[in-house]
Each structure stands twice: as structure tokens, then as C-alpha cells.
Amino acid sequence: MRSEGAAPRRAARYGALSLVLATLLGQVTESRGVMDNIQRFSSLPPYLPVSFHVLRAETAFFLKEANPDPLRNASLQSRVESFFIYKAQQPPVLNVSYGPYSAEKVIPLDLMLNPNFLGPTSKFPFDWRLKAYILQEKVYLSHPKVQVLFHIVGRDWDDHRDEKLPCLRVFAFRDSREVRGSCRLGGPLGLCVAQLEMLPGWFSPPAVVSGRRRPAERPEGSPVELYYAVQPGDERGDCTGGDTRKDNAIRPGKDGQEGRTSHLQKIGTISLYRAQDSNQLSELRLDGNVVIWLPSQPVKQGDIVTASVTIANNSTVDHFILRAKVKKGVNILTVQTSEPRQWDVRQEVGNGGKHTTTSVACQRLGPGARNRSSNLFSEVMQMNFEIASFSSLSGTQPITWQVEYPRKGATDIAVSEIFISQKDLVAIVPLAMDTELLNTAILTGKTVAMPVRVVSVEENSTLRDISELVECKATDENVIKVSDHCDYVFVNGKEIKGKMDSVVNFTYQHLSAPLHVTVWVPRLPLQIEVSDTELSQVKGWRVPIVASKRPTRDSEEEEEEEQKGRGCTLQFQHATVRVLTQFVSEGAGPWGQLSHLLSPDWQFDITHLVADFMKLESPHIATLQDSRVLVGREVGMTTIQVLSPLSDSILAEKTVTVLDDKVSVTDLAVQVVAGLSVTLHPISENNKATSAVAMAEELLRAPKKEAIISTWLQFSDGSVTPLDIYDSKDFSLTAISLDEAVVSIPQPLSPWWPTVVAEGEGQGPLLRVDMSIAEACQKSKRKSVLAVGIGHVGVKFGWDDADSSQTGEKDEEEIKNHASDRRQKIQDLERPGQDELYHGNFPGDREEGALSATTTTKSLLDNNVGKSGRRDGARLHSIPIDFTNFPAHVDLPKAKTRGTLEENGLMQTAHGLSDLEIGMYALLGVFCLAILVFLINCATFAFKYRHKQVPLEGQASMTHSHDWVWLGNEAELLENIGDLSPPQDEHTTIIDRGLGGCEENNHLLLNGGSQKPTQSQVHRPPGSGGRQTREPRQEPANSPTSKMKKVKFATFTIPPEESCPTVNSILSGEDDIKWVCQDLDVGAPKELRTYLEKFQDSV
């Protein structure tokens, strides 16, 4: 930070005293100081304190970067904020506001589009995305059909508007050939199934090159990739459009939103097999010997179900009895033996009304007969069951099994189920409204749920909602839970972690399918950010004592009236508070690597979520206002805590201290705000986050245009804070126009926020703002002013947005040129009084209520801050103003302009004087006035006797009278008269120098105890005897006053360099001090006069 004309910090402490002394004593001090290059702001730099709001978004967060650029928020004219839209049904809108001004900006789609974006928002809601499910990942030659289910993610299922949903075209490519299919999204869930039939030639192995062996079929099959494209349907809703592919594009293009949706998006890969897999059978073990195999596929009414009864090859059982029981609707048919030579089978069937039972006795034939095949089991027999009827279109029929061994007893009962359906089900698909879940229940205690539906897909691509018929189970309830009716998944705050692709399994009949949901959780402990963790009392700022503002402590007697008098106490500093965290999730791999919702470099501002659970451990020491402003109450130490809404645990804590020290307001920054604008920019590090820049318009473009002011305070401890966070009842702001022809100050509607009105064109530091304490705490009629700030105002009529657009092409050059022009004009203003000293008060040296009588020097941000804006703290990026077009202001008050050369930066402000300072300065003034009167008296007396000469015997006249002071007695003078030449080590001190006549050099060496002889030399220059002399005042020789000690001051003139009369006097005694050479004939001994006469004659 560099400041011309500012006093050095060491001299600042005594600046006021030096100014008074220099003025009273007539001394002129020339000084120029340079502020040392030290960052003045130990906390956050000042910025435009506008409010940001994201509208039309379900979930959004403001962000904080881990290592932010210090230049981003370092201008009083702008503020930069980053935000993240997590969920929105339509394009969100960013709103910025300050006072009566606001600005809005719709977030562009290119800042928020995701890879599976459905289409332009003119046709479809904003946050809709497509998700595809391949229902057959393995395709066989005997059944070469592939089905793909499409689902709209993010759509509100309760919103039944009849949108014209788009069509989807599906493509499969292999060997430069393709297969197509299509479907149209529809229904409340936004679903459709596209079907493709693979070509028979695709199942054949690759062509054989001559001379090489035909490769065997790969176990993973032949891969085929599937793609889809979005296209609008025709007027009738049919998906019969032409080829939607453009330029054979396979990957998404960048032709804009309209063209982008017609490019192909990859779905996945399927595998083709020539041979059909064996029928899948479900295994039912009755014990270690007997195992029953049943088909897992559903059956229809009238079908025959065959159960295969096998025995382990290593079993030694030769005889067992198998019993089976079925319900009404299932008929037990005959039993067939698989190996008549190995087993003898006899069946008995019994009908019990609701149940039908059968017993089958199996006897091994031959003692040594064993199956020596490589299989683990050998089939003994096959039991056939007929599905005669059932009560519903889909359901199950149980079969109860039990095996009994002679002389060993029976085994436990085992149950198998036969799935019965009249439809050919292919798969079930669980669908969630979104693919992610943000677990904010840990912070708020409110359950976060996401609806789930389960649909079945039949062979003919028919879809049916079977949500009420399924069963479900979450694999890890410490991550996510599922409701009892399987209609939604949820988190309730009791979870301990998040996970990528956490699984909830859904089952219907023989089919099952997983639902994958990514769960994000806040990282604990949370982080509490406080702009200033040490709060002090503010000197001179007294606020009324209310219930929440009790006196801070028992004061000393001399401070008790100041602290508690008239129901007021000193204000404590305020600080801003916010709570930050990161949303993380564990990876699905074995190592569980941590993933971040954005990136490790970003933190989410979650203050609005935990506001109800923030508290101070000791509320009598400090309190929180609106959960965002920390206010000191009493001296002490306390902790800000964020409590868990579901338990007694503490999610975050931060220690803050309320100090006994006092700080003073050292600077007041003023920024004129005539309007707001906002721009949005993508963040290159993460395309999901957006950066917003709010700019204050400081140029008034129309007559009577109004503007408000934004103010920041800097304290002597280096902390800075916006005045907006303080209670408006604790202070008042008064604006004063320094040029009524340019701006005027109307009667304010509010005493806390004055307004400025444009009157005529001009620019410069034309606004002064005084900050005073509350009226109820004024101790006297003298208004207590805490701080004074100077604001830059620019008024130019007819300068509209069109002019701005014309100059926008050369933005950077304009910024540099206009900044240099302003600095040049500032230097021109400085030049007439460069050498004068500005007296400012350094932080920490200002007493309570101190108010300097002169305009203080403004303090600037450091050079780094200056790079991002103007020297006055207001950035020019959006408003390149050519100040050369403004009328010149040469009649600005010089004293007021001088301290405001660096407009709108934080300035060292004046304070009201305390009573102690008033008394000290009054005493100093009286003392200086006495010295001044004394000197005036001496000067008057010297002027009166300047030309008086003493007549001597034999001489016509003397040029001057010798008004010497002899500090000795007469006897010593006579005794010490000797050699008239002065000692070699004596010097002559020139006090004053005159022209013409006989002038004298007088050297008075005061050495009261010295025994040096007194030596006197009187030389008369030639031609001096012709001068006219005044008649000396006569005094009787015997006057009583002749013996009294007298002190008399007189002025002396200095002769030219040639020989002149010189008198050297040395004080030799302390008693009987007498006048010496007052008039040479009065009060001097006769011997001395005689000696002097003889000396003159000899000369």
C-alpha cells in the first residue's frame, strides 16, 4: 500500500500535537511520508455487500474455494460469489440486491447441461435427463431380440401435464451394418421400450482368413454397441422421422442445444451367443443326500411343471421315502423313474380336500450300483405337476417337501414355489425419480425421501406398474433405507456414511433387479468460518443498553460514567459467521476411495440448513443474530456450536474471544451505488459450479437520479467489516455534499441510509459521510462523530448503455487509460500542496471519540488489491468511464479535497475528542498562548529600545544602547577586569543580523559557579560618532531599585563580519545580581564608567 502525502506511522501518534505547536509558534514543517507496504486488512478484504439469492431452484448452495484468489473480492464496487445448482425443475435465476436496487440473471443452459440432457427448455422442463436400461445383455440366436427401456429422470411424477414427449431412435452397429428401433416416451413416469432384432449373420463368428483356423466362440460372446438419439415426433405423435444421425456422429457434438440432442448417445454393450443356455433351474436341498430341481421361469395355466429328484453321487442311502404336498389348483401327476435299472419307485397319492399329498418310495436296485459320471448328482425320478387353476393372474403355488429314511426318521420340511403368470415377463426395472440423494437429514433432522416405482416388461414390450407386488431390501441401511411398502427410499439422519451406487434390491416372483442410488453425506466435523474471532469494544461508540445489551463488566470509577452513563455502554465488534462442509461419498470399490460432490477444493455454505441448531456455549458473552452475525456482549471466551438435531453430539464448534481491549474506528470506506448489474461465468475447474460477479453502478446518468451509499469500517486491530451487519439503531449516517451544483443530499427517509441526488454533471470526491453514535447516547450537544468517509461521485447525463457497448470492445485498454487519467488528475490536485503534512491517526493511537479537525488521509488497499480495480477501490471492468468528458472541478474546497484523493478506499477518519483530550489540549493551548504573549511582549520591548544609544563623556553618541544582563556582583566585575582579549575557546553566537551602523555580537555564557574572569571588549567602528542618539531615561544613583536584582530582555543586532563591539560575560557570583551597561551612566560604578571612557578614548 502506497500513500503520498501521508505522515509516517511513527509520526502519526504526535501528529495533532505537532500541528498545534507548528501553528502557534509559527514554525513550518516540511514532511513527506510513505506508508510502509503492509497489508492493512488482516481479515477478509472489503467488497460490495450485496445479497445473492438463487430463485427457481429446489436445492442450491453458495460455495467457498479452498484457496481463493485474494483479488476476487477486493473492491468496494463489486462482489464475486460462486454457487452450485444441485436440483432444479426449470432454469434458475440469480438475484442480487442491495437496498432498493436489484438485478436478475437467468443461468444459461450451457453452464448447467449434463451429458444426458433431454432437449431444449422451450419444449421440455429444465432438469429432465434420460436413463436407459438394457433388458437383455445376453442375446441368443434362438431369440435374437433386444429390448431397451428409457426413463426420464428428474420428472415430477405427480405433475400430469400432457407434454409432447420426444421420440427415441435406437441403433446397433456391427460390421458396417446397423439395426434400428424406436419408441416414444409417455405415461406419468415418462417410459418407453425400444425393441431391436439382431441380424442372424451377427451371431456367426468373424470371417476366417484363408490359411488360419476358425476361432472358437468366445465365452463372453460377440460385442455389439447400442446408441440412441432424441428426435421430435410428428404432428400425430408418430416416430417416423428420417435419419437423425448427422455426419455419422457417434459421440455428442457441440452444435448447440437444438442440434446436440440429435447426435448419438451411447447406451451400452450387449453380447451375442449362438448356443442357448440350458434351462435355468432352482435348487432345493432337503438334506445332504436328496436335492430337488425346479424350473425358475414362470408358468402359465395348464402347463406341466417337472421336478427333478436327484441324489448325491457320494451318498450311501439305498432307501428313502419322498413326500410332497400341494394346494388346491395343482394336480400331482405320475412319477417317472430316470434309471429303472438303478431305482425302484412306488407312488401313493392322497386327497385331503384343500391339499393333495403324494408319497414316493425309492429303493436302490443292487448293492454296488453307483453312478460314476462326473456330475455331483444323479437323477432318481421326475415328478410332474399340472397347473390347473389359480386365483390371480400372477402368483405362486407352494410345494412342501420332506424326505424320510427307514430307522432314521424324517427331515425338516422344505418349501419350493412355482411362479404362475399369464404374461411372458422379461424383466422388472426399479425406477427412482433421481439417481442421487443428498443426505441433509444429518444437518436438519428432516427425512429426505425419493419416490420409487417398479415396472415389469413383457415379451411384447408391455409395461406394467407392479410397485405394490414387489419385495425390497437395502443392502446397507447405514447408507440408505427403503420403506416397508417399497414405494420410496430415504435417509433419516441416522446414517453414518455415503456411498456411490448403493444398492436396494427389488424382487418380483422369480425376477429381481437392483436400484443404484448415490448417497452424498456432509463431511464431519463441519467447518465454522468467523470473519473475526477476537471481538473488542469500540472506543467512542456507545449504544443504548437493552435486554440483549447489558453492560459488559464493572468499570473503573473514571470509566463508569462513560460506560454506563445515560443508559449506554460501549459497542462490541461484530463478525460474520457461516458454516461450511463438503458432501462426500465412498467409492464402490474395495478400497472405498472418497469422492466429492464437486471437488476437494470447494466447500458448501450450509448455514441456512443448520441455523436452527447453532448456539453459543455462553450466550452472555456473545450472541448470534440471524445465525450469521456474531455480537460480543461481555469479556470472556465462548464457543460457537452446531448441534446434531437427532442426538447430543456436536457437529462443529469454533472458539471466539471477547477481549477487554478497546479498538477505534480508523477508516470508513464509502461507495456510491446507483444501480446493480450481474454477470455469470463458468468455473473452468468444475463445470457444475458457476461464478457470479455483482457490480455497483456509480455513475448517475440522469438529473435527479438517486443513489445510496455502501460503507465499510476498519478498526485499529486491522479487521474490516461492512456497516450493514450492525444494528441500524446504534448509529446514524449523515451525508454532506461538497459541491451542491453536482450532487445534493435530500432529506433522508431513514437516518441510517442517506441518499444522493444528481444535480449537474461533474465527478470527483464530492460526498462526505459522517458516522455518529445513536442520539440516545450523545453525552452533550456536541455530536459524537465516530468516522468520516469521502465518496467519489460521477454524474454525466446522456451516458447510456449504448455508449457502454461501443467502448466494450476495448475493455482492457479503456480500464488502463481511465485509471491513468484519474491518477493524473489526482496528482494535479495534489501538486499545489505536496509539501504540506497531512496528519492522520494510526490505528491504536486514537482515543475514544477522538475527532481530528482536519480531513484525514485515506488508506488504500495494498498494491495487489489495486490491480483488480481502481485506486479508489471501485472496479472499472463493466463501466469504462472517460473522466476527461466531465466538467472540471477547480473550485472544490481544497482542505476537503486533499484528504480524498484516493476516492472510496478505506480512509483514516476523524473522531470526536474525549473529555480528557479536550482538557489536555486546552491546557496546551493556554500554555502556548502564554508563550506567544510573552514573546510578543519581548518583541515589543526590543523594538522600543532598538535605536536607543547611550551618550558617553567625550563622545557625541553611540549607535545602540547595550542592554546587557550581568549575572554577577559589582565586586567580582571590578576584580576580574584584566586582559581585554577573549579566550581562544570562546565563540560568538549570531542571534540577529542587521545592516548599517555599529552592530554588536553578544555571547552570554551562563556558568554560575565558574571562576573565569569577566572580559569585555568594546570597539567603536569608524564614523559611528556622527549618529544621532536618543536621550536616555535617567534614574537616580541612589534609587532603591538600583540594588535589586533585575532581568531585562532586549533585542540585539548583528554587525558585519569586520570588527565590532563584543561583550563576553561570565557569571561569577550569585549574590547581588546587577544591571550592567544599561545606560553606562546610570546604575554603574564610577570606576567602570571611567574605565570605559578611557577605553573609548584610546580607540
Curated annotation (Swiss-Prot):
<dbReference type="InterPro" id="IPR031435">
    <property type="entry name" value="TMEM132_N"/>
</dbReference>
<dbReference type="InterPro" id="IPR031436">
    <property type="entry name" value="TMEM132_C"/>
</dbReference>
<dbReference type="Pfam" id="PF15706">
    <property type="entry name" value="TMEM132_C"/>
</dbReference>
<dbReference type="GO" id="GO:0016020">
    <property type="term" value="C:membrane"/>
</dbReference>
<feature type="region of interest" description="Disordered">
    <location>
        <begin position="1002"/>
        <end position="1045"/>
    </location>
</feature>
<feature type="region of interest" description="Disordered">
    <location>
        <begin position="801"/>
        <end position="872"/>
    </location>
</feature>
<keyword id="KW-0732">Signal</keyword>
<feature type="topological domain" description="Cytoplasmic">
    <location>
        <begin position="937"/>
        <end position="1099"/>
    </location>
</feature>
<feature type="glycosylation site" description="N-linked (GlcNAc...) asparagine">
    <location>
        <position position="95"/>
    </location>
</feature>
<feature type="glycosylation site" description="N-linked (GlcNAc...) asparagine">
    <location>
        <position position="314"/>
    </location>
</feature>
<feature type="transmembrane region" description="Helical">
    <location>
        <begin position="916"/>
        <end position="936"/>
    </location>
</feature>
<keyword id="KW-0472">Membrane</keyword>
<dbReference type="InterPro" id="IPR055423">
    <property type="entry name" value="Ig_TMEM132_5th"/>
</dbReference>
<keyword id="KW-0812">Transmembrane</keyword>
<dbReference type="Pfam" id="PF23039">
    <property type="entry name" value="TMEM132_3rd"/>
</dbReference>
<dbReference type="Pfam" id="PF23487">
    <property type="entry name" value="Ig_TMEM132_6th"/>
</dbReference>
<dbReference type="InterPro" id="IPR055421">
    <property type="entry name" value="TMEM132_3rd"/>
</dbReference>
<dbReference type="InterPro" id="IPR055424">
    <property type="entry name" value="Ig_TMEM132_6th"/>
</dbReference>
<feature type="compositionally biased region" description="Polar residues">
    <location>
        <begin position="1008"/>
        <end position="1018"/>
    </location>
</feature>
<feature type="topological domain" description="Extracellular">
    <location>
        <begin position="32"/>
        <end position="915"/>
    </location>
</feature>
<dbReference type="GO" id="GO:0010923">
    <property type="term" value="P:negative regulation of phosphatase activity"/>
</dbReference>
<feature type="signal peptide">
    <location>
        <begin position="1"/>
        <end position="31"/>
    </location>
</feature>
<keyword id="KW-1133">Transmembrane helix</keyword>
<dbReference type="InterPro" id="IPR031437">
    <property type="entry name" value="TMEM132_M"/>
</dbReference>
<dbReference type="Pfam" id="PF15705">
    <property type="entry name" value="TMEM132_N"/>
</dbReference>
<feature type="compositionally biased region" description="Basic and acidic residues">
    <location>
        <begin position="813"/>
        <end position="849"/>
    </location>
</feature>
<feature type="region of interest" description="Disordered">
    <location>
        <begin position="237"/>
        <end position="260"/>
    </location>
</feature>
<keyword id="KW-0325">Glycoprotein</keyword>
<dbReference type="Pfam" id="PF16070">
    <property type="entry name" value="Ig_TMEM132_4th"/>
</dbReference>
<protein>
    <recommendedName>
        <fullName>Transmembrane protein 132C</fullName>
    </recommendedName>
</protein>
<dbReference type="Pfam" id="PF23481">
    <property type="entry name" value="Ig_TMEM132_2nd"/>
</dbReference>
<dbReference type="Pfam" id="PF23486">
    <property type="entry name" value="Ig_TMEM132_5th"/>
</dbReference>
<feature type="glycosylation site" description="N-linked (GlcNAc...) asparagine">
    <location>
        <position position="371"/>
    </location>
</feature>
<comment type="similarity">
    <text>Belongs to the TMEM132 family.</text>
</comment>
<dbReference type="InterPro" id="IPR026307">
    <property type="entry name" value="TMEM132"/>
</dbReference>
<dbReference type="InterPro" id="IPR055422">
    <property type="entry name" value="Ig_TMEM132_2nd"/>
</dbReference>
